[in-house]
Each structure stands twice: as C-alpha cells, then as structure tokens.
C-alpha cells in the first residue's frame, strides 16, 4: 500500500499544503487521476474545498474531482489512481463516507494500488478507528470504525502544551484515558509539520518535530524523523 498521512495542512509562513507538495510528488509514480473526499469540510462548502484542493495540486499534474460531484462514486473510486481525504471534522467525514457506502471501496482500492493522501481528519480516517481525533462530535457517525489502512491510531496536531492558567487535560492525559478503556491500542502523537509515509509495507516517520508513541502501562516513547514502524 501507498499512504501519505499528514498531521496538518498548513505551517506558519507557508501556503496551504505547501510543505506537503514535495512529499506528494515523490509518491505519485505516474499517478494523475484523483478523487477528493471533501466531507470533513463544515465551514466551507464541499465545492469550495474541492476547488481549493484542485488548484493547489495542479502544479503536480493531478486531476482532482470531488466525489460529491460524481454520479457514480463507487465506479470513480474503482478507477481512481489517487484518493485524497481532506481535513476538517472527522465525525462528519466518517458519517458521510459510511452513509454513502465509500469506506470498503476506498480501502479495497488503496490495497490494490491507489495512493491514499490524507491530512488531519483524513489521516484519522486511515486508522482502525477515529477514536484519537481532536474534533468535536458534531454528528453521530454510527460507530467509530474507519478504514483500517494504517494499523496504529494517529492523534494529529499533537501537542502537550497548555495555555498558562488552563486547567483542562493535556493531550497525553486524554490519550491515556483512551488507553485505559482500550489498552490494546497504540497511539502516535503526530505533531504539526510531521507525517507518515507508507510504501511497500514500510511506514516511515518524517518531519522536523518529535513524535510520541503511547501504549497502555508504558512511558511515552519519543521518535524522530526516519523512524520505521
């Protein structure tokens, strides 16, 4: 399988997806036809989100079509070379994808050679479940099970920092809560600017910041770029 799982879409001082474009280019391998899954978009319309994505990917020669605009979406997924899943609200993304019957076809197509690119919520969707999203559950997705393309849980936008005077839980504390009720899970705290690339069965960590791995009953483990899962 070929996956590019990004913590986020924007870095300070850079244009939207600018840091990700070289990574995408390196994994295309001649692929050009892409379907875009815009359902995580809430405060922007799916048309706006699709057009924005298509414009930024034009320099890479990628032809982007929004899945919501296609009369036969399952056929489009079957024919796609690239499946791109944008960030936003993970609960809405999963709900719409499930109700439209897209989850199994997407997973099957990626397992048979399509490149999967997802940022933030799109990275969450590639995991076994969406239980490590940071998003508010604005809709009921009728279950948390997701694509299961990547075997570990990802927490995108990971930071353990708290504003001065803030008394809420740290991100690690929230992850530890999950590991109490689901100790079988392994959670990757993927900070902004970092990513995971999967190719030929090998997952490699990239990015300038320290990534953290959390397991039940164990201390967090720090990982740096180049680590192979």
From Swiss-Prot:
CDD domains in the record: GAT1_Peptidase_E
Transport as UniProt keyword: no
Enzyme class: hydrolase
Catalytic residues (positions): 120, 135, 157
Catalysed reactions, as listed in the record: Dipeptidase E catalyzes the hydrolysis of dipeptides Asp-|-Xaa. It does not act on peptides with N-terminal Glu, Asn or Gln, nor does it cleave isoaspartyl peptides
Annotated GO biological process: proteolysis
MF terms (GO), sorted A to Z: dipeptidase activity; serine-type peptidase activity
A GO CC annotation given for this chain: cytoplasm
Keywords assigned by UniProt, alphabetized: Cytoplasm, Dipeptidase, Hydrolase, Protease, Serine protease
Gene3D superfamilies: 3.40.50.880
A matching Pfam family: Peptidase_S51
Places the protein is found: Cytoplasm
Principal subcellular localization: cytoplasm
Domain of life: Bacteria
EC number: 3.4.13.21
Annotated family: Belongs to the peptidase S51 family.
Role, per record: Hydrolyzes dipeptides containing N-terminal aspartate residues. May play a role in allowing the cell to use peptide aspartate to spare carbon otherwise required for the synthesis of the aspartate family of amino acids.
Record protein name field: Peptidase E
Lineage of the organism: Bacteria, Pseudomonadati, Pseudomonadota, Gammaproteobacteria, Enterobacterales
